[in-house]
Design a protein with these regions (language model features):
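A residue-level marker of the well-folded mature domains of exported/periplasmic proteins
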Residues: 2-6, 23-368
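Sec-dependent signal peptide recognition
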Residues: 5-13
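C-terminal motif of bacterial Sec signal peptides marking the signal peptidase cleavage site
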Residues: 18-22
Length: 368
């Protein structure tokens, strides 16, 4: 998703693994083994999408550390947003004797055949944060409440703009996540359940008229793609002095692209800078919130998600039923996948200290 090497380098300072920053090229192998404890030396394959986003680096590092502490051997792989590389990595994990797979997919529907191999070998599969679609080979799903993320963003915008009190009209533009990531659809649904009524009432005006998902989606959650689209929106609809009040972004990386386009067009923080949302509470995004370049983000504590996924792995490998709190929401076209949903939190300048620093997610000196 994000391709800023400096951001990745900064993020690594707080992550307990040494990986190379950057993107493109070949997929990364971060596999290692740990001494067997109560796990009986069982092997867990962890397939992550990319190292180009801070959150996936943290997710992988957290799970690897926690699984190894329990005595599991861990094969952690990053596919650098290369779908075929991820397919090959999963197939190799199966060949190398994985007893359980944890998969955060690049393309949610592209792993059907590889996962069928896992099922044929009686290997349980846990979908991690991104639902695996069109397969009956997935056992469980660990994620955040993705529709709730969209609702949080929508409610934040509603409050900040005073929409419930009838204020407006405001000029806004919308961005969505990657069309091949089921989370993007859930988030967008939650967002528009809050904001669509204000569009209908004329309190929110979209000068570009771009609101349908197929138009506002951003393949691979790409910062560069978002920047180009924002540049086109500015040049096409805001050259006559029209004020841009808000840009609704579903991800911090997309927000960086939006901000870059605005800066390139002469927008200035504290003068004509719009409200900008985001998701993931990345280090750079948090710095941008402090400086005013980004208004808010949604914090999804990856430590909590990693903890939950690790307990799922442990339960499954011990022949137990893992804790589940949702058995209705996540239909992948083949089955409703039993899920555990963690709770996201909206973060802005008013509460980043409490949520991100006091909780130990970041250290204060990282935000200087």
């Amino acid at each position: 998703m994000l391709k800023l090497k400096k951001l990745v380098a900064t993020a690594l300072a707080g992550v307990m693994m040494a990986v190379a920053a950057g993107c493109g090229g070949g997929a990364a192998d971060s596999g290692s083994s740990a001494p067997a404890g109560n796990s009986g030396g069982k092997r867990v394959g962890v397939a992550m999408p990319t190292q180009s986003s801070q959150r996936w680096i943290q997710d992988g590092a957290n799970m690897k550390e926690k699984l190894e502490a329990l005595g599991y051997q861990v094969d952690l792989q990053y596919a650098e947003d290369d779908v075929q590389a991820q397919v090959s990595q999963i197939e190799n994990m199966i060949t190398n004797g994985a007893n359980c797979l944890v998969v955060a997919s690049i393309d949610s529907s592209a792993l059907v055949n590889a996962l069928a191999q896992a099922k044929a070998n009686n290997i349980p599969v846990i979908a991690y944060d991104r639902l695996l679609m069109d397969t009956d080979s997935v056992s469980y799903y660990a994620t955040f409440d993705n529709k709730g993320v969209g609702t949080l963003i929508g409610k934040y915008v509603e409050k900040q703009l005073g929409l419930a009190e009838g204020k407006g009209p405001y000029n806004v533009e919308f961005f969505a996540g990657s069309p091949d990531d089921n989370n993007a659809h859930f988030l967008n649904d939650g967002l528009f359940e809050v904001l669509q009524k204000y569009i209908d009432k004329g309190q929110l005006v979209v000068p570009s008229k771009q609101t349908d998902f197929d138009t506002i989606c951003t393949l691979r959650w790409s910062q560069e793609t978002a920047q180009r689209r924002m540049e086109d929106i500015i040049s096409g609809y805001y050259t006559d002095g029209k004020k841009l009040d808000a840009v609704i972004s579903p991800f911090d990386g997309i927000s960086y692209g939006i901000a870059a386009a605005l800066e390139g067009a002469g927008y200035q923080v504290g003068k004509n800078w719009p409200l900008i949302t985001g998701q993931d509470a990345e280090l750079m995004a948090t710095k941008n919130i402090i400086s005013g370049k980004q208004t808010m983000t949604v914090f999804k504590d990856t430590r909590t998600l990693a903890d939950k996924c690790v307990t799922m792995v442990q339960a499954v490998l011990e022949g137990k039923d893992p804790e589940i709190n949702d058995t209705t929401s996540y239909n992948n076209h083949k089955l409703v996948v039993p899920s555990y949903l963690c709770t996201p939190v909206a973060v802005d300048k008013s509460n980043y200290q409490k949520e991100l620093i006091d909780s130990g997610y970041y250290k204060a000196d990282q935000l200087k």
